[in-house]
Amino acid sequence: MLTQNYLKLLSVDGVNRFCSKPYGFELLILLYDFTKNNDEYGIEETFEMIHYNKCKRPAFLSFIKDLEAEGIIFRIQSKVKKSRSLLRLNQDTIDEIDLKNSSDEL
């Protein structure tokens, strides 16, 4: 069942792009939670939260720029600290992930 759920998630355009990197799925989970909960974690804090298969900071920032260019994620300014940029998944990706997860419950 877990394999089927994972394959369903990979059918979401944004999700399969995240999974092109060894740390991508963990990053996806973090950004999903940050977006849903409106958490105030900046880019550097997000990088530090990745525990498995972590890359070097320049490679991470390059991947973030690629995801932004593809419209999968975007940056917003923190309301708490103006110098902090927050990463968010786009709403279409969130909706597709939620749809895939809710179809499992049926």
Predicted regions and their residues:
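Short acidic, hydrophobic short linear motifs in intrinsically disordered regions
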Residues: N37-I50
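A short, conserved structural fragment
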Residues: E68-K79
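Minor-groove-contacting beta-hairpin "wing" of winged helix-turn-helix DNA-binding domains
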Residues: V80-L89
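Short amphipathic alpha-helical elements of helix-turn-helix/winged-helix folds
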Residues: L30-N37
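Short alpha-helical segments that sit at the start of domains
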Residues: L2-L30
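Short, amphipathic alpha-helical interaction segments positioned at domain boundaries
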Residues: Q91-L106
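Short amphipathic alpha-helical interaction segments
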Residues: N53-A69
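Alpha-helical ligand/cofactor-binding cores
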Residues: S62-D66, R88, I94
